[in-house]
Regions:
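Low-complexity, proline/glycine-enriched hydrophobic segments characteristic of transmembrane helices
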Residues: 42-85
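Aromatic- and glycine-rich beta-strand/loop motifs that create alpha-glucan
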Residues: 1-20, 24, 189-191
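Secretory targeting signals
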Residues: 23, 27-58, 92-93, 101-106, ...
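Junction motif at the cytosolic side of a transmembrane helix
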Residues: 7-10, 272-279, 348-369
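Hydrophobic alpha-helical transmembrane segments
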Residues: 4, 17-22, 255-260, 287-288, ...
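Transmembrane helix segments
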Residues: 34, 280-315
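Loop-to-transmembrane-helix entry motif
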Residues: 11-15, 195, 199, 283
């Protein structure tokens, strides 16, 4: 425990990591200001918030505009057919799954149609919220900002781990560490300390991002609104239809689940970083290899074969969750439109990363001076 505290202290005292974290925070602040934070947008959001939550005190102009929008889009579930959504998506994307794989995707969309019928019966789609196609708050937070957050926190995690794991080589004491079994076991503490510090920096950046966003966008009395509500819906792939979530997910539940996925992704990144550094023993080379590795994995996600290998490839590719950010826990990607797909990706990718790290540790313990 004492060694762990000492290693964490090294990382938390390093000025470069704080500079990177603060720089990312400023970048998020500017992004939020651009999307929803300028004075005109904040004023409009406050006025619309009153129109959504308290019609009696709302401005007539905003109340009328909101009523017209609700009249236009408030009944989308009445005619929503998930089979037609599937057909349109296949046509637009050019993706045509065949055989048993194609039937499996069709069955997933049939289950989504049952979910649509459930939403109709329970009235889940009738809740009031900011007009989705006007403000695009869901895609702004969980798409644009969350994707930036994933990249930024990933960099912070990688830098934290590489700094501690390569500390001895940088300061010319690696020979002393590799000379004994006890010295080699120190690397496990360094890996854990690096992961904890990476989570600390990531937590600071995430909290800052959320505080700034929700300071700009009033959410009082809206946390209970389901993400599947018609008013939350936004245009996607030149189509306008609701976010059909696999379960009833209010705004606060969706935020918590998004945070869980973010932590899971950071855990995978930590394991992969440890594995690469254990193999290469050089933080500069490791950082370059990690960048190429994740970039390659991201591009691989766009390779389509039209069979079950597409699903297997996505299960073992954590960058898929980056690509689909904003569409988690709902109908989105054709291959992943089934409940729990996010956790399946985290489990499979995490298992592969841990196995790779175990191989790296085995190799590291065989190193000699």
């Amino acid at each position: 425990m004492r060694l762990l505290q000492k290693e964490c202290g090294k990382c938390l005292r390093h000025p470069f990591l704080w500079i990177v974290c603060i720089t990312f925070g400023l970048f998020q602040f500017l992004s939020i200001y651009t999307y929803v934070g300028n004075a005109g947008m904040r004023k409009e959001l406050r006025q619309m918030h009153v129109a959504v939550t308290d019609e009696e005190t709302a401005s007539p102009e905003y109340e009328s505009a909101y009523a017209d929008y609700k009249k236009t889009y408030g009944g989308m579930y009445d005619t929503l057919d998930m089979r037609k959504i599937l057909e349109q998506k296949e046509k637009k994307s050019g993706y045509e799954p065949q055989g048993a794989w194609g039937m499996w995707i069709v069955r997933n969309y049939d289950r989504l149609q049952k979910r649509v019928e459930q939403i109709r019966k329970t009235g889940e789609g009738t809740y009031a919220f900011y007009p989705g196609s006007w403000y695009k708050l869901h895609s702004t937070l969980y798409g644009k900002l969350w994707k930036k957050l994933i990249l930024q926190t990933a960099v912070l995690m990688i830098l934290s781990m590489l700094y501690l794991m390569d500390y001895e080589r940088i300061y010319k004491t690696q020979d002393l560490v590799l000379a004994t079994t006890t010295g080699k076991k120190m690397m496990e503490k360094k890996m854990l300390a690096g992961a904890l510090c990476g989570l600390f920096y990531a937590g600071l950046l995430t909290v800052f991002t959320l505080l700034v966003f929700f300071a700009a966008v009033p959410f009082q009395n809206l946390w209970h609104v389901p993400v599947a509500a018609c008013m939350v819906a936004e245009p996607r792939l030149q189509m306008m239809y609701p976010f059909v979530t696999f379960w009833r997910l209010e705004q606060w539940r969706y935020l918590l689940l998004a945070l869980v996925v973010l932590v899971g992704l950071l855990g995978i990144i930590a394991a992969v970083t440890a594995a690469v550094q254990l193999f290469l023993q050089n933080s500069y080379f490791s950082f370059a290899v990690l960048g190429l590795l994740f970039m390659g994995a991201y591009l691989l996600g766009y390779v389509q074969m039209g069979n079950v290998w597409d699903l297997i490839r996505e299960f073992f590719n954590p960058t898929v969750l980056y690509a689909t950010s904003g569409g988690w826990f709902m109908e989105n990607d054709l291959c992943l439109s089934f409940a729990g797909n996010e956790f399946a990706v985290l489990f499979c990718s995490g298992t592969a990363a841990v196995c790779l790290m175990a191989v790296g540790k085995r190799r590291y313990h065989r190193l000699e001076v």
